[in-house]
Structures are given as structure tokens and as C-alpha cells.
Amino acid sequence: MMLLLAQWLQGMSSELGFLRVFQYLTMRAVLAALTALLIGLAAGSWVIGKLMALKIGQPIRGYAPQSHLSKSGTPTMGGVLILLSIALSTLLWFDLSNRFVWIVLLVTLGFGAIGWVDDWRKVVDKNPEGMRSREKYLWQSLIGLMAALYLVFCISENSNAKVLELFISWMRSGFALDLPPKAGLQLPFFKAVSYPLGVLGFVLLTYLVIVGSSNAVNLTDGLDGLAIMPVVMVGSALGVFAYVTGSAVYSRYLFFPHIPGSGELLIFCAAMAGAGLAFLWFNAHPAQVFMGDVGALALGAALGTIAIIVRQEIVLAVMGGIFVAEALSVMLQVGWFKYTRYRYGEGRRLLKMAPLHHHFEKSGWKETQVVVRFWIITMLLCLVGLSTLKLR
């Protein structure tokens, strides 16, 4: 919005040439981060007060660690503050004609809506489990598949008109259309090496990345500040990749696929970082508010969608290693318990408790130790991911 306003004002008077500074992507990214940060800090206390007035307090599951019982009643659904800050800042500073930012915004808000319903049922219906798993996955799958079907052609072509033509060609070809190399699975540490996926393969991968990332971040959000800081770190790193893939010069120099328009995602990533830091101000131990599913599901979906657009799905798994570990810990715990119950008549556990952060709590780590150590690990993993920019 500000970009269009600056361009309009420049056309009105030659004396306003200094407004050309808003054409620089990096400048708008800095302003987006600051805007989201200020919105979050300014509105945070008001949002928390409203949540408390509405008695939207976090119910604690009966099997949670004893140390968590004191958190019962802490306002949840604070993710609304994050999404509000991201949306307002992004709309203010990005190029409104950019299709990639719009799709990320829509996916983020769509998953946020799912999380909102889930949280609402928890606090209003007094059901700690919220939405039924099948219902939640149904809506997640619907949004994920819709995004995947659009992105597979959107990444392959540079305009929406050509996207429609490519879709029609795919239908007429009997669903056997070849995609350009940039739509393949990019292998890190190799120069211009990609594995062809085809349309259906791309759609399946996109669905798994978006839905998987969403639920992985949601599982990680179990301790004060645990999920939000890794989201900020990974999102910021993905912003760097977006800047590179969106630049014809840098992408060619670093042997990355050039995705015209993807650089504008740096604005969204910057806004997400600013909003995340503002939320951390209130979510740091002892937390004044929890983000809830409305925040966790949305932020995870945003990370997954951005990674798909900039073709860094594998790098996302590396940088978001904490999210991957948390999700795997739950799957392995549940799978092993069911297997041993079937095999031996008694369910057994691999971990003291899942997700993984609860295992370390049960092992004697303090909550703040788990959180900060997971932050440190994420920072190191992000550095490994960023090293793939040059180590190819």
C-alpha cells in the first residue's frame, strides 16, 4: 500500500523523489519488521486484557507435567495478536500486485481460522482436546491442497494468465505435463541439481510440507516462548532465501532457481519476525499469554508455504529441526505404544513423555533451560541452512 502511495506521490511532484527509497525491498522489509513489532507491543496489553475479560484461559490437560498446573487460566488465543500484526504490516509495505505474498497471507489466515475454532472449543466448551483430529486435518488438507494446486503452476509461470494456460495444458495432456526444473525438489549443497516431481508429486510434497509444518509448530508450542523464537529465526532465514530466489542476479550467481516475484516474501518474513518478537515480550516465562492453535497452526503453515515457493523444502527441515524432532517424538511415541500393546499386551513408551520438550522436563531440566537450549539449537541449524547459499 505504501509503495503505491509513494509512486503516486512521485508522479504528482518531482520534488518527492526521495520517496523512491520505498522501492527498495530491503528498506520496506526493515519498515515491515518495525511496524509489526510496534503494533504487537502497542496492542499486546489491550489484547491480553480482552482475552482475560472474556475468560479465554488455557485449560491444562490432566496428563501434563505437574509444573504446568499453575498455568491454568493463562489467556490463550494470543496468536490473534501475531496474525493482526503480520497482516497489517504486510498489507502496508508489500507490493499489492504480488501473488506469492497473497497466497502466503491467505494460507496463514486460513490455518489461523482453523486454530481459532480449535481454541474456542477448548475454552468455551471446556474441552481440552478442542477440534476432533479428523475434522482439523480435513480443513487443513483442503487449504493445503488448494494452495498446492495453485503454486505448482504459479511457480512454473510468471503471470496468472499463463498459469491458467498451463493448467489447461496439463488437463489436456492427460495429467502428464512436464514442469520446469525450478519446480523440482532442489537438493542443497549441489549446484542447480533438482529432482523432477511432476504436477502430482509437487502437489503431494506441498501438501505434506504445509500441513506437516503447521502441526509440527503446534506440537512445539508447549512451553513459554518455546515455539515463537524458532519461528522468528527460521522465518528470517527463509526471508534471505526469498530475497535470493527473487533476484535474477543473486540466484544466477549462487546457482539457485529464479522465481520472479518471490523476493517480495521478504516483507512477510520481516513482518513475521517483528510480530514474533513483540509476542515474545508477553510470552516470555512466566507467560502472560499463550499463542494457542490460532497462532501455532498459522505460523507453521506460513513457514511451509514460503519454503515451497522459494524451493527450499529440505532446508526448511534442517533449519526447523526442532519442529521436526517434536513431531517425530509424538509419532514414534504413539506408534511404539500401539505396537507394544499389540505385541506384548502392554503399551510401552520410548520417551518419558511426548512431545520431546516434556521428556526433558521429566528428565529434570527446568522449563527455561529447555526453551533456551532449543533456541540455541535452532540458531545453529539456521546457520547450517544459510550456509547452503554458498556451499554448493
UniProtKB/Swiss-Prot annotation:
UniProt pathway: Cell wall biogenesis; peptidoglycan biosynthesis
Keywords, sorted A to Z: Cell cycle, Cell division, Cell inner membrane, Cell membrane, Cell shape, Cell wall biogenesis/degradation, Magnesium, Membrane, Metal-binding, Peptidoglycan synthesis, Transferase, Transmembrane, Transmembrane helix
- Location(s) in or outside the cell: Cell inner membrane
Q: Which cofactor does it need?
A: Mg(2+)
In short, the EC number is 2.7.8.13
Q: Which PROSITE patterns match?
A: MRAY_1, MRAY_2
Keyword Acetylation: yes or no?
no
| A molecular function GO annotation | UDP-N-acetylmuramoyl-L-alanyl-D-glutamyl-meso-2,6-diaminopimelyl-D-alanyl-D-alanine:undecaprenyl-phosphate transferase activity
TM spans (from-to): 29-49, 76-96, 100-120, 137-157, 192-212, 225-245, 262-282, 289-309, 314-334, 369-389
Q: What's in the GO CC field?
A: plasma membrane
Q: Which domain of life is it from?
A: Bacteria
Q: Specify the protein's topology with respect to the membrane.
A: Multi-pass membrane protein
Q: Enumerate the InterPro entries for this protein.
A: Glycosyl_transferase_4, PNAcMuramoyl-5peptid_Trfase, PNAcMuramoyl-5peptid_Trfase_CS
What is the catalytic activity of this protein? UDP-N-acetyl-alpha-D-muramoyl-L-alanyl-gamma-D-glutamyl-meso-2,6-diaminopimeloyl-D-alanyl-D-alanine + di-trans,octa-cis-undecaprenyl phosphate = di-trans,octa-cis-undecaprenyl diphospho-N-acetyl-alpha-D-muramoyl-L-alanyl-D-glutamyl-meso-2,6-diaminopimeloyl-D-alanyl-D-alanine + UMP
One Pfam family this chain carries?
MraY_sig1
**What's an example GO BP annotation here?**
cell wall organization
Which family does the similarity line name?
Belongs to the glycosyltransferase 4 family. MraY subfamily.
- According to its UniProt entry, what is the function of this protein? Catalyzes the initial step of the lipid cycle reactions in the biosynthesis of the cell wall peptidoglycan: transfers peptidoglycan precursor phospho-MurNAc-pentapeptide from UDP-MurNAc-pentapeptide onto the lipid carrier undecaprenyl phosphate, yielding undecaprenyl-pyrophosphoryl-MurNAc-pentapeptide, known as lipid I.
Name assigned to this protein: Phospho-N-acetylmuramoyl-pentapeptide-transferase
The organism named in the record is: Verminephrobacter eiseniae (strain EF01-2)
